[in-house]
Structures are given as C-alpha cells and as structure tokens.
Amino acid sequence: MNQAIAKQDRPVDLLKATINAPSIQEQFKNALGEHKDTFVASLIDLYTGDKSLQTCKPSAIIIEALRAATLRLPLNKALGFAYIVVYNNSVKVTNEQTGREEWIKVPTPTFIPGYKGYIQLAMRTGQYRTINADVVYEGEVRKVNKLTGEIAFDGEKTSDKIIGYFCYFELLNGFSKTLYVTVEDMAAYAKRYSPSVKKETTVAQLIAKANDGIIGKKVGWEGNFNDMA
C-alpha cells in the first residue's frame, strides 16, 4: 500500500492526473482537435526528461503548454518550434512563523516560441514570400551599408568560426529586410536580459558557446546558444 501511495505521488503522475481533468482535456481538444493526444504525449515526455520542470506546479506547466497548443506549436526540443523554460522568479510571501513578508525563489515555467515557431507563425499570416535565418561564418560578411541597412553575405567562408547571425524576410508586396547581429552583441544581450543565464556566467563564456559545438540538455542560452540566437 505504501508503494502504491509513493507511486501516485510521483511528479509525472501528478501531471497526468491534472491533464486528465475533464476541463483540461476539453481545452486541449478545443485547441488541437484530433492532434490532442499526440501533443499531450509529447508534453509528458518533455516533463519526464526535464528535472527542472518537475519542480514546478503541474497546473502552471499546463497553462504554458496550452499557450503552445493554442498556437499549434509542438513542444519538442529537437524540433525547435517551442519550449517551456523554467525561471526561478522572486515572489513575495508571508512567513507563517514570523508573520513578516520575505522574498523567495519559485520555479516558474514559461512558454517561449523557438525561432522556427516564430517563422511558422509569420508564414501563417500569408504575407511573407520568404523568411530565412542562419549563422554567419568568418569571411562571409563582405559589405555592410549603414545608410540603407543592406548587408552582403556573399563573401568566401574562411573558417568554421561563427561570427554572427542574420535573418531575412521579404513580403508579398516586395518589402524586404535583413538584420545582422554579431556573436559579441548577441552574448551581451543574453547576459543582460535573459533570466536563464546564470549570474556567474560571463559574456566571454557565452561567446565561446557559439563555437564549441556542444548542444546541452538545458533549454536556453547556456544549453544551445546558436539556436537561441
């Protein structure tokens, strides 16, 4: 009997119990239709393989998963369309023993579209002829026109060193735009604005991740810098 209770208390069992609630099932069905079961299965797989997610309340995870479901973006790390990232947010609570207010860290799941997800959402509008994004290697940037914002990437690649990232889009009406950010600027941005980057992580360490060829198990800048960029 004790073993049965312990099994029921496993985090994944608590998540499944929450998902199986009729109201939650209805929300997933409304968002996904016949694809509901596949999406829920991928959510459970994601949760089972991510210890940080297991520290969060199941109800909070499902709220974020429903956001992905509403946008019809799969929650599969390997696909890169959408992620649920855990941030340790500061929350003010009242200490029951002292009666005083204090700040504590609470693991908070957060839905974040991946770059492939953003591209898919944009293409669904029917307004884009082309959308592309990729890394830029040393030697490929031939010319940058500050006045017009035009950038020529037709230079000869001289090494496998990643020096930056670009994105390009063209609308059906002919308007087009190219954006380019260096690895250094991207690392500085991540360090300054991303809650997922540890305080002790330096900009230099983030820059190194762009070229170390290592894809970590974590989601975010420290797990896969180039995908985030």
Regions found by a protein language model. Give the residues of each.
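Intrinsically disordered, compositionally biased charged tails
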Residues: M1-D9
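Binding-interface segments
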Residues: V12, K16-A229
